[in-house]
Every structure is written in structure tokens, then in C-alpha cells.
Amino acid sequence: GSPNSSENGGVDSVDYVTIASTGNAKDFGDLFLNSMTAGAGANPVRAVVANGKDGPAHSNVIFKVNIATLGDSSDFGDQNVSRQTHGACSNSVRMVFGGGGTPTKISSIETLLLASGGNSVPFGDLGAAKSSLGACCDATRAVFGAGIFHPETHTNNLEYINIATGGDTVDFGDLLDNSKTQGGTGFSNGH
């Protein structure tokens, strides 16, 4: 994450909360690089972070942590394309991330298998190049929404892919308004 929107390099901390109880977040460990504008996914065993930026530079590093054990991250692999402000989500098998900036806005979608380490691979394309988009998944479908086209035009478009097979996105409808910077999008580990 990043403590603010400046180019200060982000932070390397990982925190967690216990969903079954109330209370403040606690320290889980550290990423091995500072990170900001990253995307994340998880299955019941492993959480994975596809890095966005490390200071002013874009980073293609993918981190992993084992959910059951507190501790620092380790290397999972590399993104095919270094990107920031991308939409990312996962089901219990696969993580997908799409769009983002390099800093030029891009449309490509990549995937990785959560159970095994390794580099991400191409998996399809969004309908248009955009950054600052959100994503969410269930066991079958990954939905990407909102974002910013070039030049700084916001969109309310929703589009999806079949998470098992990939491919180019299909229109899924529209949000009620044009939105950007969909930080805080998430996923459920209940699938």
C-alpha cells in the first residue's frame, strides 16, 4: 500500500485482521520491496501480491505469503508486464489482473496459478486500455469495473472473463456513475 498518493515509494508492511472478531489490524510481516498501487489475490493457503510501484519505478515482482503463518513475503515470480493501478482478484485456483499503467494505460490481462510459484502469463484483453480499475471474482467469473481511459476520461463500464479459460472480456453492464481508483475492491475466500 501507500501512505498517500505521492511518489514516496509506498510501504513494505503487511497487516491482518481476524474476521470473526472485532479489533485493530495487527502486523503480519513485511514485503521484501516497498509497494504501492499493487493488486492482490488469495486462496485458503496463500496470498499473492502483484506489485505496482517501488518508488518512482514500476515493478514486475510478485510476492507471496502463507496465510497460516505470520512472516515476511517471499518471491513468487514476475509479471509479464510491469503495471500499476491494475484490477486484480482470484478464486481458489487462479489469480487474474488486468489493465493498469506502465505508465501508459494497457488492456492486457495476465494470470497465475496460486498453488505453484512462477511468472504470470497472458490471459486475454480488456475492451480498452485503462488504469485505476477494480476487480472481483467468484469461482467462475472475474469482473473488471470502472477505471480511467486516456486522456483521464472515467468509465462506468463493467466487463468479465471466464476465470477458467480467459480470453477477451465481454460486456457485463454499467456502474451507476463514472468511477476511478477502485481501491478497496476485494474477494471472498468462501469459494
What are these regions (language model features)?
Residues 1-191:
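Polar, enzyme-active/binding microenvironments
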